[in-house]
Amino acid sequence: MSEEDWPSPKFREHVIQRLEPELARNRQNAPNLPVPGDARQVEEYVFAKCMSKDEYMRTIAKVINAINCNSKSAAVPSVLQPSQFHSPPCTTAALLGNTPAGGTPGYRAPVPPDPQPTSAQARNPPVTVATTQASTTPSAPNPPGGLPAPSASATAAVAAAVASFPSPDTSIRPGGQITPGSQAPGGGPTPAPNVPFPNGSSQMNGGPAMGQPPPQMGAPNMGGPPNGYGGYGMMNGPPGSGAPMGGNPYNQQIKKDMDQARPWDPSAHMYQQQPQWGAMPPQQPHGYPGRPMNGQGATPTGPSSVLESLINQPQQYPGHHNQMGPPGDRNVAAQRAAAQQQQQQQQQQQQQRPGMVPNQGMMSSEDQTVYSAKLRNMRGSCDSLRTRARQCRHEGNHEAAHKLEVMLSVLEGKRVVSLEYLNHLEMWIARKQDFLNIAPMSQNQNHMGMNDPMMNGEHAMLGNGQVPNPYGGHPGYGHQQYMGPPPPHMQMHQPPMWHQQQHQQQQRMMPQDHMMMQGGGGPVHGMYRGDMGHDPMTSPVNNHRHAPYPNPAAMRNNMRMPNGPGPIGRDRNSMSGSSMSGPSSGAPSMNPMGTPNQKMGTPGSMGGMSGLDDLNYDDFLPNPTPIDALQPTLHVGQNSMNAGPPVQRSNLNETARKELQILDARFEIDPNHQRHDANHIIVVCKIRNQQFPPLRLVVPTTYPAGNVTVDRAVIDLDAYLYDDLQNSVYERLSRPGLSSITDYLNAWEEQVNQYQNQTSGGLDVAFNVGNDFFYDNLNL
């Protein structure tokens, strides 16, 4: 069927015809799990909810799947437990007395799902409550008065009826009218309009939610007015039998729990105002209205919440574990169910926020433990995901923003997903650590001297959970004012590791970190000195250390002061050897912005050995980390962190400058050239009027003599959405035949134009891998 046929009445009528047999099967096999309304009402609700054909078809499929799950889980063959009771969906013939006592009807005629009158709305309980209680209530109690044990289906119906425990003063007349007694346990009288049903039978006869037999069977408390119990005689028993009277505390506890679990879906209150759903409340299977909870009226939660629950959480209804159990003692069953309900509630409160759908009950206890542990481990990525989602939303990339927000809601516990989805999300976060680390890096730019425009743009977008340095960066704010360990919010936003294996390094360096915080120092022990001189061993600034590595840009200059102007080892790996520099001398100086400037030193108690791990660890990485890639425009202005000489900025020779000036009309050249090593300079180029990541050319100082190459940073923050483009660009630029700056820039622009023609959105393909998996496993 083509796309144009979707909104047509013919297309929708076909869907209604497909839904009708599923709903009829649900009414017969799952009386305790009703779907409100008939097939047309369900289809109209879905049609009003969905905005496209794909969404419409997915939602219809979810409804059918949910109905099938309910029907299969609740259907119990009547031959398993022969009884004088009928199965809950009693037929019209049984209601008229044509079925002999003790027989089981072999034919179930469906009752037309005629809507109830509006006057019966006050008697309807929240259907979600009755639905959920049907799956959590234990086996039914023994029927009083020597009645035989009910069948399996009747037992399930009786268990569900515990949730509707009314006042014993409320009697039910044969004509279907509820007579209000003295007072309902909820505090208000029960409304009692006389509303006959379309099939002519009373409200009580064959009511599946009550689980009683037809009137002709002669049960003492089943048939109507005697003793004032009506269909609830099985629950309360006759007077003098010792059965509990009035409100049921266990039932009240369940109602309280279910009411707390309901507000998770705000659309429930929105859809109940629609005419087809708000004006006529949904009827129970076979036209039996629901009973008020303990005499109370229905809650404002509209019937759409039931269908919304079926659409969103089809596995919300497990296989009714307790419905097949033998009848037990009433008090023991209630106590056991109350303890089980309390335990489940505590687990849900630990694993998710209040108001969430209890999805995780489907997991085993071992899986729940793994699920919670993974959530705790990934909780630190929430701020980064939130920042990136906000940035994508601001840039108009709503698709990427929505995906990031979905991941964020999973990590924050707002969505409970499968363990398989969580594993995939964990792998994705580990693979995208390069751009997820932008959040803490942007936050620390104030006291690390980073003034790059891109970094400032990121910092401007950090709105949640970002706080300034509590130790201050102004004159007079020495560390004598703060003697304790770093505050929790600073521990959450640690300085980034500048490696792709950040989280593994943090875990491996934890013992060393703990030792340094207590008695020693570390490579960064002098990083936040005040305007007074301190002993490196006794300064409380040692407690400020969060991570095993300091800012490499700050250490790159400090390491050169005591050892002369030459670098230690390779210049690109100077961050690794910076912690081996000698002790500093003299009092620290303050720059005009008030930021303490102190040369780095090694504490005497460590004997200069604390930096060995720092020195050698970077050598195990696949590629050495170019320090200039991590040090954007450090010395623009007077906000430097260090008292040493400024970073050496080498200018290009005249030939390279003239060539770049010719290309200035098409390319934007960063004027702040960074030194790559002793003989090469990095030139950062961008294509004008384009949002693609910049290109980093490594130009020799003797240009045009020497070879121009391309540098690809290990942590490429600008290219996190363009993995495919970057791979194709670097593959093209690695081919032979390119020698000059112009050759490289022309080839780069050509490759970008080809990529732009092939893709419309520009979103990274690697970012889109498994998008369907993300959505299919989220139980939307």
Curated annotation (Swiss-Prot):
Induction remark: Expression increased by simulated microgravity.
**Feature: compositional bias, Gly residues:** 225-245
Organ and tissue specificity: Expressed in the intestine and head neurons.
Q: Where is this region: Interaction with nhr-49?
A: 1-124
Q: Where is the composition biased (Low complexity)?
A: 125-139, 333-353, 574-594
Region annotated Disordered sits at 91-152, 166-363, 564-597
Q: Where is this region: Interaction with sbp-1?
A: 2-96
Per the UniProt record, one Pfam family is Med15_C
Whether Disulfide bond counts among this entry's keywords is no
Secretion signal, residue range per the UniProt entry = none
Q: Enumerate the GO terms in the molecular function aspect.
A: nuclear receptor binding; transcription coactivator activity
**Where does this chain mainly localize?**
nucleus
Q: Where in the cell is it found?
A: Nucleus
> What does the entry list under GO cellular component?
nucleus
The source's superkingdom equals Eukaryota
Keywords from the named record: Activator, Nucleus, Transcription, Transcription regulation
One of the protein's GO biological processes: locomotion
Stretches with biased composition (Polar residues)? 296-316
The record describes its quaternary structure and partners as: Component of the Mediator complex. Interacts with nhr-49, nhr-64 and sbp-1.
Q: What does this chain do?
A: Component of the Mediator complex, a coactivator involved in regulated gene transcription of nearly all RNA polymerase II-dependent genes. Mediator functions as a bridge to convey information from gene-specific regulatory proteins to the basal RNA polymerase II transcription machinery. Mediator is recruited to promoters by direct interactions with regulatory proteins and serves as a scaffold for the assembly of a functional preinitiation complex with RNA polymerase II and the general transcription factors.
Q: Which family does it belong to?
A: Belongs to the Mediator complex subunit 15 family.
Name the record gives this protein: Mediator of RNA polymerase II transcription subunit 15
Source species of the chain:
Caenorhabditis elegans
